């Protein structure tokens, strides 16, 4: 219901192209954090301290207390105020790949970044410009690449502090094997099987066999 309040402001099925979406609660949160920074700057403190004040306003202020109340009411207190207040970020080494001459850096497995790496590595095997922007073939390739990347991400990705992610997952060689599963004449009917990056196999032997594409994927050329 709390999501419907925002996404279905005009009623279910009544959102149209150009509908104005107003997230008042998010606006209040951002202003709350801005006010904390301004109070810090008004005291003559440097901007770095002001930024920390905005951060603490979120993790140690009323928003954190609201998170605590919500989880106690709906999710048996799985996240608490103490969890919020005790959280501290850290510096991470970014993931890296290349795409047609460009260097691409993303955050690690706790973010959406690795999915981008997987997708770009597969897309590099296709000449998207030759396919033509937004043509049926162009959209088909991108949609199939997204499906393959999401299948692998559901199997292998997670916070690297708690999940061992095979380093081979991000290699170009593995992406090439996965891209071979794409049939230009038929789309995946369901989520495709996850692969086996450690052994450079397009499909892992333990993956579900509900794969409904061609029984034998055409060799990628």
List each model region and its residues.
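Flexible, polar/acidic helix-loop-strand segments at domain edges
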Residues: 114
């Amino acid at each position: 219901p709390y999501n419907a309040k925002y996404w279905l402001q005009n009623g279910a099925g009544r959102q149209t192209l150009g509908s104005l979406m107003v997230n008042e609660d998010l606006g209040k949160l951002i202003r709350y954090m801005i006010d904390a920074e301004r109070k810090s700057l008004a005291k003559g403190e440097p901007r770095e301290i002001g930024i920390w004040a905005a951060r603490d306003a979120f993790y140690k202020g009323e928003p954190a207390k609201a998170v605590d109340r919500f989880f106690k009411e709906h999710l048996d207190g799985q996240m608490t105020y103490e969890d919020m207040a005790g959280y501290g970020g850290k510096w991470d080494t970014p993931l890296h790949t290349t795409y047609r001459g460009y260097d691409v850096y993303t955050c690690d497995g706790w973010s959406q970044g690795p999915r981008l790496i997987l997708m770009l590595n597969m897309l590099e095997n296709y000449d998207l410009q030759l396919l033509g922007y937004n043509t049926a073939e162009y959209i088909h390739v991108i949609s199939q690449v997204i499906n393959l990347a999401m299948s692998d991400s559901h199997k292998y990705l997670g916070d690297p502090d708690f999940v061992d992610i095979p380093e081979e997952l991000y290699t170009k060689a593995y992406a090439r094997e996965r891209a071979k599963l794409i049939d230009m004449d038929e789309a995946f009917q369901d989520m495709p099987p996850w692969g086996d990056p450690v052994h450079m196999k397009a499909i892992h032997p333990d993956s579900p066999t509900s794969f409904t594409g061609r029984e034998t994927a055409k060799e990628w050329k």
